[in-house]
Amino acid sequence: MQPDGDDGPILDAALELFGEVGIPRTTIGDVAKRARINRVTVYRRIGSKDDLVRAVMARESSRLLVAVAAAAAEQTSRADRAAHGFATTIDSVRTNPVLIKMFDSESSLVLEQLTTNASALLVSAINAAAHIARGELESDTFAVPDAPEIVVRVVHSILLTPSATAPLDTYDDLLAFAHRNIVPLLVGTT
């Protein structure tokens, strides 16, 4: 049995199984077996399968935001931080095999968590976008009011509907798009 509060092994096991067999085919029993714990422990620590999916999605979102912040921090200007933050977010989700499997899942819960119940996820992303774009500045002044929310909603839209008219297939495409459209919202024209 894991120490109280250490849900990492459970979430790791669930994440692996979601990637291997998909969310619909993963059971609490499978997760418990992979985590080498009793099935009751999963229910006690996490809850239902829906709670498990939510917990995995929340943890992966947090990990993604940390990686995006680290990539943005390597840049020297606010404009480059904003552009690389944008491009890294989309590229990281698109290239993560488990997240791809979750996006492609037939699970109505995943779809719900990415659309109608995405507010908690979006708020976290908006706060992270504001922090990244603000950089060393202490104020929340952006070129366009509500710019971090607009940017996150654009990212969200691109992830849910990858293809339209703008070329957004490669990291360089994403950077160019960000410099044309995202940077002016956050930091003004460069």
Task: Please tell me what each predicted stretch does.
Residues 71-75, 103, 107, 162-166:
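Secondary-structure edge/capping motif, primarily at the C-terminal ends of alpha-helices
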Residues 51, 55, 68-95, 148:
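Hydrophobic alpha-helical connector segments
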Residues 35-46:
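Short hydrophobic/aromatic patch on the recognition helix
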Residues 10-18, 64, 68, 89:
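Short hydrophobic clusters on alpha-helical segments that form packing/core surfaces
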Residues 62-65, 110-152:
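Amphipathic alpha-helical packing segments from all-alpha helical-bundle domains
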Residues 91-95, 131, 149-169, 181-190:
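Amphipathic C-terminal alpha-helical segment
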Residues 80-104, 113-121, 130:
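Helical hydrophobic small-molecule/effector-binding pocket
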Residues 1-21, 25-34, 51-54:
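Basic, helix-initiating cap at the start of DNA-binding domains
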